[in-house]
């Protein structure tokens, strides 16, 4: 059996025990328990950022946040059950007690499944625990709960998921969707010395954005697409009011003239930018093709990362703000180690042509990255001539 199946069995077992408790507690006790779970989870999500912000280790931060939420959820549920049982004791009529018990079973099942879902959601964004994230993402039971959850309820764990997303990259897939992984050979390490890397390096720039509303400095990569124009990811400049492009070691002030959070693409106007533009490939890449990711991982030095195309797919998932309404994009999945800071960088073929724009990495598979295809971003090229500044929306998290 898979870890996901064991997780489903565990959740259903706890739900069965909860159903017995619901029979004894009755409808009111179970409803109060449900209210206690929601209040406990909400309190945990509100308190967690202030408490775990003092913890530097990502793994310790994850488990500290989950322990806090679990403790408050348990306190809320127990308080609700105790209050409910006190009221139930006043019901003497046997038929009414029977109806009360049946309703209690149903409500208590909802309580436990909701609590399990609330605790599992942050784990789907934990890059520090890829095996655990994979098990949670593969859970059929939790996936059904996620489908049934109302939009307002999904905002409760969303804040904590953003806090615990240590990858620095926005979620690409729905919380309980597994990354599609087509097996391909390991990338060729010799690609870093291919002459095409040195030839394209000047046109790949580092981007630093100041987002004072969320007290963040955002770092990513971009590349020249026409004279004085740079393409990058929207999440690299989200919420910013000051953007600087670095060509080599020289800084250039930039203005965001196009911002699309659905596709996750932004275009920057950068006057007097000297590097020449890169050219987009006319033909799509095939599975197994040698390719290279160019970027500034971690906001550090220019790095060429060997990669290999897994497949080209139509991928459905959230936009950069995690909107519940999914967007569908043409994407390459690649075998490569994509890191924070690579966002917005080009994926090039061995002719130096751009196959797409890097925009994410898989949580449940450390060797898989996501790239918007050249065809997907082609529509954005119509905005190259824009000159007026546009808004950059809210901060991503």
Swiss-Prot record:
Disulfide bonds join 214-395. It is a multi-pass membrane protein. This is Serine protease Rv3671c. GO terms for biological process: proteolysis; response to acidic pH; symbiont-mediated evasion of host immune response; toxin biosynthetic process. It is found in: Membrane. The record marks 160-161 as: Cleavage. PROSITE patterns: TRYPSIN_SER. Disruption phenotype: Disruption leads to an increased sensitivity to acid and fails to maintain intrabacterial pH in acid in vitro and in activated macrophages. Growth is also severely attenuated in mice. Belongs to the peptidase S1C family. It is an enzyme of class 3 (hydrolase). It comes from the Bacteria. Keywords: Autocatalytic cleavage, Disulfide bond, Hydrolase, Membrane, Protease, Transmembrane, Transmembrane helix. Pfam families: Colicin_V, Trypsin_2. One of its GO terms (molecular function) is serine-type endopeptidase activity. Signal peptide: none annotated. The keyword Transmembrane helix applies. Disulfide bond increases the proteolytic activity by stabilizing the protease in the conformation in which the active site residues are properly positioned for substrate binding and catalysis. Gene3D superfamilies: Trypsin-like serine proteases. One of its GO terms (cellular component) is peptidoglycan-based cell wall. Autocleaved. The autocleavage activity is significant only when no reducing agent is present in buffers. The active site is at residues 235, 264, 343. Inhibited by reducing agents and activated during exposure to oxidative stress.
